[in-house]
Amino acid sequence: WSGEDQGLLGSHAYVKKHFGDPTNMKLLPEQSKISAYYNLDNGSGRIRGIYLQGNKEVLPVFKEWLQPFSDLDATTLTLCNTGSTDHLSFDAVGIPGFQFIQDPMEYETRTHHTNMDSYDHLFPEDLKQAATIVAALVYETAMRQEKLPRKPLPAAQPWIFDLFK
């Protein structure tokens, strides 16, 4: 997505065009067809688990799906929210949005948003681990008979993107 660091502008525009507008909660038909949005946005660190964004109903599902990756130490499931990344645009219109918990590596301290934020700071083994886990969760989500459990639909948030106009 573009404009993430300026206020989730790219993902917000996509969600508004295809799924609904969180400022008035006028949802589009496609909103009911998407099961989940997965986001991997914190650099090259290994996946350690998933922020569930307060979605208690999905906890047993992800626990089962992550079990095969216990040897890769990707077992943490927290109901806590995490912010400042694109899954929030989807969550704001009632689509389950999840951010992976990752090892921070140098992400916040040395390379994040600097001219040092380049491919030579990637860790191939971490990327392979992350790709495997993300692919498995996307596959499990797609093959599931029903959509992932959803939290109650949030109230309209007319102020949510006012800061970025």
PLM regions with names:
Residues 43-165:
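Active-site-adjacent substrate-binding region
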Residues 1-61:
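Acidic/histidine-rich catalytic neighborhood of metal-dependent amide-processing enzymes
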